[in-house]
UniProtKB/Swiss-Prot annotation:
GO molecular function terms listed in the Swiss-Prot or TrEMBL record: 2-C-methyl-D-erythritol 2,4-cyclodiphosphate synthase activity; metal ion binding
Source organism (scientific name): Shewanella amazonensis (strain ATCC BAA-1098 / SB2B)
Protein name: 2-C-methyl-D-erythritol 2,4-cyclodiphosphate synthase
Pathway the protein takes part in: Isoprenoid biosynthesis; isopentenyl diphosphate biosynthesis via DXP pathway; isopentenyl diphosphate from 1-deoxy-D-xylulose 5-phosphate: step 4/6
Keyword Lyase among record annotations: yes
EC numbers on record: 4.6.1.12
SUPFAM superfamilies the record matches: IpsF-like
Manner of cofactor binding, per the entry note: Binds 1 divalent metal cation per subunit.
Amino acid sequence: MKIRIGHGFDVHKFGADRPLILCGIEVPYETGLIAHSDGDVVLHAISDAILGAMALGDIGKHFPDTDAAYEGADSRVLLRHCFKLAREHGFAIGNLDVTIIAQAPKMLPHIEAMRAVLADDLQTELNNINVKATTTEKLGFTGRKEGIAVEAVVLMENVK
């Protein structure tokens, strides 16, 4: 098969006494996200999308939250591992589209830095990476500022 599509979704709750890390960068906010790893909800959704495109399960299978080895893990390392698996199967990023769903903090000032990190980690051109943010107009848990949700869709192209 020449192309594959993967979809990833993740949610994390606010409340951790640590920095808010999204796409590997620190985003100023009053609290971080609760998680076994560093809580980078964006990279978790992208990792799941890549694994899904390759029919390799999900990040819970590869990096279980019951394994102390992944406690506080840098999600960029996890993402790079997932991408390496895709490369081993002969695939590269065609394009990636990410939607961050959060009432706060505002994402716009950080979007270009996020795109640059992703392009670097996924060894692709910046114009293959899109990151956007939206709110739920104060509805639901994201609207009440209880957490952040992320959806990611990736098109993987066979390059062998």
